Amino acid sequence: MVEIVSAHTDLRRQGVRYTGLCPFHDERSPSFSVQSEEKLYHCFGCGVGGDLFDFVIAIENVDFPTAVESLAERYGVEVKREDEDPQAEERRKARQRLTELMERTASFYSSFFGDAPEAAKAREYLAGRGLGEEILKDFGVGFAPSAWDTLLIKGQQAGYSIPELLRTGLAQKNNKGGVYDRFRARITFPIRDARGRVVGFGARATRDEQKPKYLNSAEGELFHKSEILYGIDRARGPMAKAGRAVVVEGYTDVIALHQAGFTEAVGVMGTSITEAQIAMLSATVDTIVLALDADAAGRKAMLRAQQVAAGRSLRILVVAMPAGVDPAEIATAEGGAETFRELVDAAVELPEFHIELVLAEVDPNSPQSRDKVLGDA
């Protein structure tokens, strides 16, 4: 239990128990206690408590069956399922093999990033962006070798078939039917679902001739970009504690903000926020802070959030990001954590942001301006 809880708050041993700051409410003095032998937790500040299952249910905002499956997967325990028909069991086990393949691939990419001479420029690039080794390791950032068949060979050597490699999106076919690695000579960011399972990868180019600059896993059995948020596995607990989610665009934005202490940050992996992503956030928080880039695409995405969140009891705030600067650049600069905190504190309600956008785009001396403002706002 100590291992599970330690992923959400720092614990210090005091005899037979461990103490730390409560992950469920803000406090300055530790009032959260874990009894390691009894496998129980209790907070003397807010009163929450229970066993390991209660903790997972509360911190991850899931039901009991999901908590059981999450813990079983973490510790490699197979959960017996009564009355499961053979076909359903076969599908479940086949999917489990795919997630295991993705996890092994993430580990391989991470090790290659840390050790391989070929990844030296990638390490230099991320260090130059102000991202430390510890946070990169925490997020499992890796590097895909430049060879066309490294993963194909390693995957088959580990007992996985080419169809399985294709189903995960780790391999793809060319127009002649040949199969090759999808990610090559790219920085890799493992994308995990809310339960911490690797379902896909984002991959950044390291060479000028590589297009596109960012390449995601193909949509498939495991990966559905519109239904996942980068960093959600790490951010859900902090989100619940803070009562808000900070939503940014890219992988490095999320990593940099977590490094700066904004562990409630998640990424939409692009500019568009979807109904599924809004639903995922609203299950945990009642406030969403949008910190998207201050370009046309970012502004459009922020306005779209207003549409997809319609009908939900959500408060949506918009951070006025400086032009030409992304959250990662702010967070990794000297004094960046305080600068970003000030930007978040100054965030405006989404309807107010919408009106400000409309006013900025019209000529105040034009007789048509009033009609445009009233029509668009």
Please tell me what each predicted stretch does.
Residues 66-121:
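Conserved active-site segments centered on acidic
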Residues 314-377:
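C-terminal or mid-to-C-terminal helical accessory/interaction module adjacent to the motor/catalytic core
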Residues 53, 245-247, 285-297, 319-320:
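Acidic beta-strand-to-loop metal/phosphate-binding motif
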Residues 83-84, 136-137, 141-143, 147:
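Terminal amphipathic helices with adjacent charged low-complexity linkers/tails
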Residues 14, 87-107, 145-288, 302:
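Phosphate-handling DNA/RNA-contact segment within nucleic-acid enzymes
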Residues 1-85, 89, 334:
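N-terminal structured subdomain of primase-like DNA metabolism proteins
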Residues 58-77, 185-205, 329, 333, ...:
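Structured, non-catalytic alpha/beta "coupling" segments that mediate domain-domain communication
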